[in-house]
């Protein structure tokens, strides 16, 4: 059995505005193993995106904790969380969030620049990842010169350029047509096999979720069931 990479222990998240309290997450507990491909399925507003923000250290739970590689995030400073996000975690969103004035190569290189890698390593590694997603021939093109599917591939290359242990993906194909969505999920599976990267994908699409090795369902801020979707139509 693979080692547990990330563990959630009774995560709760509450927002308060004046006298109004809104509970978004209720005692969420689960784990992700090294190299695992997992989906969390739920409708819009079910708490999936809030959960990803907590897992990535972008927000703080009201109670409970996230443990990454045996280390509680609650014990980490802001600087240590930022380093964790840069070195050990990758993020993919529904919208690519590429910098419009930078080329594909420069966008992919950004996490390496932030991590203060050597210039020669930055260029070679960024180009290597563009090649891995089939876009090395588009390295010098800006986002406006790329198709929607190509832009998302660049975003995936950027998420994986630092060899993260885990990639958190929030509706990564939600802005793509069926053909490009299928291509992106095939790419994630290939990168998982080649690099051993674990993926946690949140989505409302059961057809996409079934491609993952494990699926959990979220409703109203609660994990309600472990689904069996393999081969579902």
UniProtKB/Swiss-Prot annotation:
Keywords of this entry: ATP-binding, Cell inner membrane, Cell membrane, Membrane, Nucleotide-binding, Translocase, Transport
EC number(s) given by UniProt: 7.6.2.-
GO MF terms held by the record: ATP binding; ATP hydrolysis activity; transmembrane transporter activity
Domain of life: Bacteria
One GO CC term on file: plasma membrane
Gene Ontology terms: biological process: lipoprotein localization to outer membrane; protein localization to outer membrane
Domain ABC transporter: 6-233
Pfam families per the UniProt record, alphabetical: ABC_tran (PF00005)
SMART domains, alphabetized: AAA
Assembly and oligomerization: The complex is composed of two ATP-binding proteins (LolD) and two transmembrane proteins (LolC and LolE).
Protein name: Lipoprotein-releasing system ATP-binding protein LolD
Organism: Shigella dysenteriae serotype 1 (strain Sd197)
Name of the gene: lolD
């Amino acid at each position: 059995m693979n080692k547990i990479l990330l563990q959630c222990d009774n995560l709760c998240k509450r927002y308060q505005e004046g006298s109004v309290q809104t509970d978004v997450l209720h005692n969420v507990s689960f784990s992700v193993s090294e190299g695992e491909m997992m989906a969390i399925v739920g409708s819009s507003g079910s708490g999936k995106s809030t959960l990803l923000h907590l897992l990535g250290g972008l927000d703080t739970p009201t109670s409970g904790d996230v443990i990454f590689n045996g280390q509680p995030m609650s014990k980490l400073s802001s600087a240590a969380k930022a380093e964790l996000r840069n070195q050990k975690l990758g993020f993919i969103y529904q919208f690519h969030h590429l910098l419009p004035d930078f080329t594909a190569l420069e966008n992919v290189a950004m996490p390496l620049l932030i991590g203060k890698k050597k210039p020669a390593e930055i260029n070679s590694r960024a180009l290597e990842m563009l090649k891995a997603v089939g876009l090395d021939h588009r390295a010098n093109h800006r986002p406006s010169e790329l198709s929607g599917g190509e832009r998302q591939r660049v975003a995936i290359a950027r998420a994986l350029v630092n060899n993260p242990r885990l990639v958190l993906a929030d509706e990564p194909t939600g802005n793509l047509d069926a053909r490009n969505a299928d291509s992106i999920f095939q790419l994630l599976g290939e990168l998982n096999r080649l690099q051993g990267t674990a993926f946690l994908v949140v989505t409302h699409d059961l057809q996409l979720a079934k491609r993952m090795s494990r699926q959990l369902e979220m409703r109203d801020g609660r994990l309600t069931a472990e689904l069996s979707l393999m081969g579902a139509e």
